[in-house]
């Protein structure tokens, strides 16, 4: 890419209040509203109400109140995996990456088949530049959630950070097969096409334009790379 590697758009969209339709990225990761787990005793109505209150606080951005209520849930239902995952996501939003990873590690240790737990842990590890760990977590998420476009997107971005662009392209295409309107995946696939030697400019342009149509912000580096050189 003309001796320059473009920044990848790894967008983690979380619930916001008052967002107008079409002005926010499609929500990709959100807290789990259900405490119940297969093969375990059903959570009481009282505990579920506390969890619902925590989710409402988290959606409003009151992370401290949400955390207090999530911890109350764990007092009543120790080792509840959905709550551990929610706490991991909450700590991620607070940028407490170490604590987020600790919560998520506990969750996937108790429920190794939790695709959501592996996905969020992979994103947390990615944001700490722990790309090898992120690859392992996201690969596990992809095995557990093969029909999840978000998993393939984040897995592809992480492969791209390692310089494995062919695999990254494959994962972006899988994401788009599952969700053709995934703006971030279109954007990142355009970036990966520009990493080819020679760059696949027309393919990149097609996906970049589609990303813009779907609400992605214009990127001057990508736009310059798609502009034919002046004679």
Please tell me what each predicted stretch does:
Residues 23-38, 191-231:
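Terminal, low-structured helical/coil segments at or just beyond the last alpha-helical repeat
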Residues 47, 81-82, 115-116, 149-150, ...:
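Helix-start (N-cap) detector for alpha-helical repeat units in TPR-like alpha-solenoids
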Residues 86, 120, 154, 188, ...:
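Canonical tetratricopeptide repeat
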Residues 59-69, 93-106, 127-140, 162-174, ...:
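Structural signature of tandem alpha-helical TPR/SEL1-like repeats
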């Amino acid at each position: 890419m003309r001796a320059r590697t473009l920044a990848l758009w790894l967008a983690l969209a979380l619930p916001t209040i008052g967002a107008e339709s079409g002005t926010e990225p499609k929500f990709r990761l959100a807290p789990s509203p259900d405490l119940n787990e297969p093969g375990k005793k059903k959570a009481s109505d009282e505990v579920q109400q506390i969890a619902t209150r925590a989710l409402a606080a988290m959606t409003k951005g009151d992370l401290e109140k949400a955390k207090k209520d999530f911890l109350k849930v764990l007092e009543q239902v120790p080792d509840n995996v959905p709550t551990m995952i929610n706490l991991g996501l909450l700590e991620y939003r607070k940028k407490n990456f170490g604590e987020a990873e600790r919560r998520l590690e506990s969750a996937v240790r108790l429920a190794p088949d939790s695709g959501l737990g592996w996905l969020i842990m992979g994103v947390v590890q990615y944001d700490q530049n722990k790309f090898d760990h992120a690859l392992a977590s996201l690969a596990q998420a992809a095995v557990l959630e093969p029909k999840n476009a978000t998993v393939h997107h984040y897995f592809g971005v992480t492969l791209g950070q390692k310089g494995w662009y062919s695999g990254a392209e494959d994962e972006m295409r899988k994401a788009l097969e599952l969700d053709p309107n995934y703006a971030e995946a279109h954007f990142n696939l355009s970036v990966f096409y520009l990493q080819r030697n020679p760059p696949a400019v027309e393919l990149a342009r097609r996906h970049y334009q589609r990303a813009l149509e779907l609400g992605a912000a214009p990127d001057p580096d990508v736009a310059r790379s798609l502009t034919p050189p002046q004679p």
